[in-house]
Curated annotation (Swiss-Prot):
Gene3D superfamilies for the chain: Homeodomain-like (1.10.10.60)
Name of the featured protein: Transcription factor MYB98
Cross-referenced SMART domains: SANT
Keywords: DNA-binding, Nucleus, Repeat, Transcription, Transcription regulation
Keyword Cell membrane included in the entry's annotation: no
Motif window: Nuclear localization signal 1: 195-202
Disruption phenotype: Impaired in pollen tube attraction associated with a reduced cytoplasmic calcium burst during pollen tube tips growing. Altered expression of several ovule-specific genes.
Organism of derivation: Arabidopsis thaliana (Mouse-ear cress)
Expression by tissue: Expressed at high levels in the synergid cells of the female gametophyte, and at lower levels in the endosperm of young seeds and the trichomes of young leaves and sepals.
Subcellular location: Nucleus
Biological function: Transcription factor that binds to the motif 5'-GTAACNT-3' in the promoter of target genes (e.g. DD11 and DD18) and promotes their expression within synergid cells (e.g. in the filiform apparatus) in ovules. Required for the formation of the filiform apparatus during synergid cell differentiation in the female gametophyte. Involved in pollen tube guidance to the micropyle.
Transmembrane segments: none
Amino acid sequence: MENFVDENGFASLNQNIFTRDQEHMKEEDFPFEVVDQSKPTSFLQDFHHLDHDHQFDHHHHHGSSSSHPLLSVQTTSSCINNAPFEHCSYQENMVDFYETKPNLMNHHHFQAVENSYFTRNHHHHQEINLVDEHDDPMDLEQNNMMMMRMIPFDYPPTETFKPMNFVMPDEISCVSADNDCYRATSFNKTKPFLTRKLSSSSSSSSWKETKKSTLVKGQWTAEEDRVLIQLVEKYGLRKWSHIAQVLPGRIGKQCRERWHNHLRPDIKKETWSEEEDRVLIEFHKEIGNKWAEIAKRLPGRTENSIKNHWNATKRRQFSKRKCRSKYPRPSLLQDYIKSLNMGALMASSVPARGRRRESNNKKKDVVVAVEEKKKEEEVYGQDRIVPECVFTDDFGFNEKLLEEGCSIDSLLDDIPQPDIDAFVHGL
């Protein structure tokens, strides 16, 4: 009986606290209605703004389901399941997901406070009974009271709830074992680079082909020489690329070489003199086959003319024909080239002689080694590991030391003996 009275008192105390909390919440414009104590229903039963087009169908959807213990609604979804990469198909009656309040307390009856507004269509409304008929009214009231105490009063109203964007593009969300969306969306990063490289190479190759097609590699005509002389007089010796634009099929390098080697007014075209050959020999001894440098020191002779004169003289040096009247005797340049050739032959023959000497020295070393080996075999023998030594009489044992009447004891008598008595007494 005492326990019954205590329980009634505890129930009245909880009812008074619950009433004060409801009044305070009403003053703070809490969005939920105050629960009437006479009606054994949940305080969430008046949420009648649910769109009937977004009701959860327990039989149509296939997938994982979770029951809400407080709202008594069985929620199912075909998109969210245990398989993280399961194909997520689009359906017309698919509901949006909204932010939820985290778990308020470790109680098995309420897990989250969910927003009951689904922003799809607000044309038709249908009231859903959120109370299970089998639930105890007292348990529901206690749960409501405990949850209302846990919810902060500054909790944002229903209108400020923002939907969470769970919608992902089909290329990302549709990833499964039978779907190749990931393979389709993953592109090769090097593909643009390869494209640019191929395009640049193709463009460069096409440019080279057009350049080669327009380039003329034949001999210069008299008309081209005349035009080139006029252009050089007009533009000078610097603007070869500009001059080449006037001459179709020619480039600046061709124009410059044609001018300096053939069309220059101060070029000497007569036969080389002995004095010029002497100067050429001196500079060749100094700097070698640098024809451009030699041309700077030989006025009137171009790089091309100096090289041609050198090669022609070398060919005459090895020619078996008789000397013509034009060249009655070998020139100074021919003698110089001949001396160079002889020096080259001598230099090439020196290594051969050196190799012969080395081979002869090796042969001598082999002969000496064979002779030394023969001597060792004669001294030590062929089958003996230890060499056979021959001793002379000087190293023999003197047998006269042990004649008759002599013994080893007689030999030891001559050895002085220490004073044992003095050693014992410490003297």
